[in-house]
């Protein structure tokens, strides 16, 4: 393998797609919360819940569709708990979100042993996984990337511009942004901030669950303890540094997925694992700092 193929090849592009899809779904859910003025640190738990729910339901039913539906429902259930506690009961969202992350990690580990009688990883050869409609295409360069797209990947591609259109060009979207910018002013105009924030958290729950389903049933068909592996915290950091700007969010996630894909391949030529593991975070941080500075110069930063 040449040095160029390690950093730029169809295989790298396919790996980027596989890594980017769950990040995008989870990131869009987090963005909805952020624009509604909700600091959602439970994204890690939402994704992990989706991972387990998808595999458990797929194993029980033999259907990936049922697995995806269960993942979305499980994510929505965790988000409902967060919304009920932080919005209805006025609990600290940071404390409650962190507690939910810990609870989900412990619960999925317990259920893995209780339901499947295994520790660490559950994997079965006949476990239904998501279809890949473009598998087998012979297109040069982009062929492997298209083959890596599942239906949830196509959903992620469509969801990003759809969310932009909703937030910028619809009345409910503008009201949601108004709630995030100044809830008191929004309430004076007859908008109910709690209702929009509750809905934003539920949307994040569904998208987080779908992100987990993509992670566990997309390119693989398995569940392992703590499968989300910090991706939710990566999204939280990216959202904080991107200032709620969708282009900056997507660019940062793309850089993260690319650096992660290249890092894995560079391990095969002797790059220390610690360096390859750190590369996605360092690259993403550099991009966010650069875009943040540019935005401030242009007066676009919030």
Where are the predicted features?
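Short loop segments and helix-boundary regions at transmembrane helix junctions
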Residues: 33-39, 78-134, 169-171, 227-247, ...
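Loop-to-transmembrane alpha-helix initiation sites
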Residues: 94-95, 121-125, 148-154, 197, ...
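Transmembrane helix-bundle core of multi-pass membrane transporters
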Residues: 105-169, 271-276, 302
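Helix-loop-helix "hairpin" substructures at the membrane interface of multi-pass membrane proteins
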Residues: 144-223, 246-251
């Amino acid at each position: 393998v040449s040095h160029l193929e390690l950093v730029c090849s169809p295989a790298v592009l396919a790996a980027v797609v596989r890594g980017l899809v769950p990040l995008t779904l989870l990131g869009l859910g987090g963005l909805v919360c952020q624009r509604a003025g909700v600091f959602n640190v439970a994204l890690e738990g939402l994704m992990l819940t989706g991972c387990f729910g998808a595999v458990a339901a797929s194993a029980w039913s033999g259907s990936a569709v049922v697995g995806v539906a269960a993942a979305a429902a499980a994510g929505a259930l965790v988000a409902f708990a967060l919304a009920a506690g932080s919005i209805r009961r006025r609990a600290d969202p940071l404390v409650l979100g962190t507690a939910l992350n810990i609870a989900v990690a412990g619960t999925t580990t317990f259920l893995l042993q209780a339901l499947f009688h295994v520790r660490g990883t559950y994997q079965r050869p006949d476990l239904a996984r998501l279809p890949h409609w473009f598998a087998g295409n012979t297109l040069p360069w982009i062929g492997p990337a298209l083959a890596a797209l599942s239906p949830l990947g196509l959903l992620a591609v469509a969801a990003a511009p759809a969310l932009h259109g909703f937030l910028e060009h619809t009345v409910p979207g503008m009201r949601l942004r108004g709630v995030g910018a100044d809830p008191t002013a929004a309430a004076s105009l007859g908008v109910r901030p709690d209702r929009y924030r509750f809905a934003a958290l539920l949307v994040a729950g569904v998208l987080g669950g779908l992100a987990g389903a993509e992670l566990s049933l997309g390119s693989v068909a398995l569940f392992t303890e703590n499968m989300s592996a910090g991706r939710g915290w990566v999204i939280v950091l990216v959202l904080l540094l991107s200032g709620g700007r969708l282009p900056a969010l997507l660019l940062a996630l793309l850089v993260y997925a690319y650096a992660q894909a290249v890092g894995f391949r560079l391990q095969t030529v002797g790059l220390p694992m610690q360096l390859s593991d750190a590369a996605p975070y360092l690259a993403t941080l550099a991009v966010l700092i650069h875009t943040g500075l540019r935005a401030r110069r242009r007066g676009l930063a919030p």
